[in-house]
Regions:
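C-terminal alpha-helical interaction appendages
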Residues: 2-100
Length: 100
């Protein structure tokens, strides 16, 4: 059974990025924050920009860096998840590599 929530009530005051609703992957809570924040997938945002706005990957990444990641809209600003890092367990700890 699915439960539908009113995002404005569940994450009151969270910044929603217009036109990027399809890139939402969750909601983030942390101690000391005044409320919940929307969690977006960087890769999904880049895909939306490429398809919707007919950008190349490089153009989409530059637009993301300056106009989305660089946007500060207050304490409940959106946060972004980048799944391009792969954790690798080593004998003496962890190593992190970028996906190719």
């Amino acid at each position: 059974m699915r439960v539908t929530v009113d995002i404005d009530e569940y994450a009151e005051g969270a910044i929603l990025l217009d036109g990027l609703e399809g890139a939402i992957v969750g909601i983030v809570e942390d101690f000391g924050s005044p409320g919940r924040k929307m969690l977006y997938s960087k890769q999904k945002i880049l895909n939306i920009l490429q398809k919707r706005d007919l950008m190349t990957y490089d153009e989409a990444e530059e637009f993301y860096d300056y106009n989305i990641l660089g946007l500060y809209a207050g304490e409940l600003n959106a946060v972004f998840l980048d799944l391009e890092i792969i954790p690798i367990k080593k004998e003496d700890g962890w190593e992190y590599q970028l996906k190719e």
